[in-house]
């Protein structure tokens, strides 16, 4: 199963130099996956009061995506296991692959306020497809060299009353010297939602063409790494 949609990359999707932001790119990926999910789950009663929450992103950028581009984003649900559902995404433009990604989602029961085991009816409805992009394993580092303090804005919150997952990509842009246009790979793993915090810490360690990062307060909110071209 796969679904695709064409998107025009207008200035609202781009940063100061006309390149698409990671927040915008992931938002468009979520958009096409939501369109697919609404169609597939329309008559599945077992999905009542359940939602998909993002658990992690693996994204590889092979070509720049700029303002004025017309891109096609395709999403393919590959497989599911217990609480988790895995999706591949492919971003194409001018006959070329511009980016590919793996998104991991966790099924959440809104009534019980906990993760829910995926019902067999959902497995059958989505089916399985081979993974064309498996992402990478990542081991969180223990020691970070530097940190910044990030203020949480009311506009960062979405209808679920927590900071939108895409905003985390904006937060890591506060790392000095991080140039979003030159990112070739990014891993983002979400842990605990940002709900009541007024500020969070942004911890990071720079290496050669690589930055490890963590977003946290009294609890851990997210971590991952960025690689440059």
Locate predicted features.
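Hot-dog-fold acyl-thioester-processing enzymes
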Residues: 1-54, 104, 109-180
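Phosphate-/nucleic-acid-contacting segments
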Residues: 182-185
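HotDog/MaoC-like acyl-thioester-processing domains
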Residues: 4, 56-139, 190, 194-199, ...
């Amino acid at each position: 199963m796969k679904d695709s949609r064409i998107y025009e990359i207008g200035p609202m999707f781009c940063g100061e130099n006309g390149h698409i932001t990671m927040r915008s790119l992931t938002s468009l990926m979520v958009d096409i996956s939501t369109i697919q999910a609404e169609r597939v789950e329309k008559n599945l009663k077992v999905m009542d009061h359940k939602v998909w929450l993002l658990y992690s992103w693996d994204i590889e950028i092979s070509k720049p995506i700029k303002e004025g581009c017309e891109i096609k984003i395709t999403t393919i649900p590959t497989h599911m296991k217990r609480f988790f559902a895995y999706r591949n995404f492919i971003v194409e433009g001018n006959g070329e692959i511009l980016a590919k990604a793996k998104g991991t989602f966790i099924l959440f029961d809104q009534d019980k306020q906990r993760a829910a085991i995926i019902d067999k009816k959902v497995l059958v409805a989505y089916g399985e497809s081979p993974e064309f992009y498996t992402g990478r394993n990542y081991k969180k580092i223990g020691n970070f060299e530097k940190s910044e303090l990030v203020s949480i804005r009311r506009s960062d919150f979405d209808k679920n009353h927590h900071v939108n997952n895409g905003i985390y990509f904006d937060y890591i842009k506060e790392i000095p010297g991080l140039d979003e246009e030159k990112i070739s790979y990014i891993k983002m793993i979400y842990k605990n939602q940002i709900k009541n915090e007024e500020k969070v810490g942004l911890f990071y360690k720079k290496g050669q063409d690589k930055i490890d990062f963590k977003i946290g307060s009294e609890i851990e909110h997210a971590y991952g790494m960025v690689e440059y071209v």
